Amino acid sequence: MCLAEKDLTWEDKFIDLATNEHLTPEYLKINPNGVVPTLVHENRLVHDSSVICEYLDDVFPDTPLSPKDPHARAEMRAWMRFHEEVPTIAVRTPSFNMAFLPRFQGLDEQ
């Protein structure tokens, strides 16, 4: 979303979580934690959505997404952290169960 808001061009690489593509040796080379997203910019890697957004604001300052006022910027960061820590975690277990539990039903304990 930040790339689009800054009117930047980019190349998407879809990572299929359902097939564990994020756990392949190829993907783990660019993100050892096996999570998405990862930004590759000028052969450098940037992980984590919020960090990527702040990085893009630093590298491409012509269309700023962050407020200039330090207090407003702190509030923005607080909301970004809230988004990462509260709703993301709250939906992780139900989302995992809906997406992956059917694959495991009927399997024996081996």
Located regions from the model:
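GST-like domain detector, emphasizing the conserved glutathione-binding G-site
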Residues: 1-110
